[in-house]
UniProtKB/Swiss-Prot annotation:
One cellular component term from this protein's GO annotations in UniProt: extracellular region
Membership in a protein family: Belongs to the eIF-5A family.
Induction line: Up-regulated at post-transcriptional level by iron deficiency.
Compositionally biased intervals (Basic and acidic residues): 1-10
InterPro entries linked: IF5A-like, IF5A-like_N, NA-bd_OB-fold, Rib_uL2_dom2, Trans_elong_IF5A_hypusine_site, Transl_elong_IF5A_C, Translation_prot_SH3-like_sf
Name this protein carries in UniProt: Eukaryotic translation initiation factor 5A-1
Length: 158
């Protein structure tokens, strides 16, 4: 054994948070990065090629974490950044007083670094279901280094 100790904290193995995709191939309900925010595309319109230049794509998208509306216009032949968006389901174990949740992962360990969602209706559903003693499964969306609870699944009483 050597005296050197290596500590690797990264969990994404150096993988890129986004990948390039040609603007003309991004469709409604797809994902795109606008102003460094991961967004879901709600509307795409394409303008014809003009006298000087390319056809342009006009994207209207909603930030997947803040629900803010963002817009961007990109030449259809150019590449856009598309975020790697992952959805994972976890069983809710506990809600702490400071607003953090304790979640059970598939391999049996716990995940304790997520806060309750900002969405009031979802927040109330989670709290009331948890207070009623139901087994709750929350859906966590992650993209570009951010994570947030975005859905709730009720799997019945305990």
């Amino acid at each position: 054994m050597s005296d050197e100790e290596h500590h690797f904290e990264s969990s994404d193995a150096g993988a890129s948070k986004t990948y390039p995709q040609q603007a003309g191939t991004i469709r409604k309900n797809g994902y795109i990065v606008i102003k460094n925010r991961p967004c879901k595309v709600v509307e795409v319109s394409t303008s014809k090629t003009g006298k000087h230049g390319h056809a342009k794509c006009h994207f209207v998208a909603i930030d997947i974490f803040t629900s803010k509306k963002l817009e961007d216009i990109v030449p259809s032949s150019h590449n856009c950044d598309v975020p790697h968006v992952n959805r994972t389901d976890y069983q809710l174990i506990d809600i702490s007083e400071d607003g953090y949740v304790s979640l059970l992962t598939d391999n049996g360990s716990t995940k304790d670094d997520l806060k309750l969602p900002n969405d009031d209706t979802l927040l109330q559903q989670i709290k009331s279901g948890f207070d009623d003693g139901k087994d709750l499964v929350v859906s966590v969306m992650s993209a570009m280094g951010e994570e947030q609870i975005n859905a709730l699944k009720d799997i019945g009483p305990k």
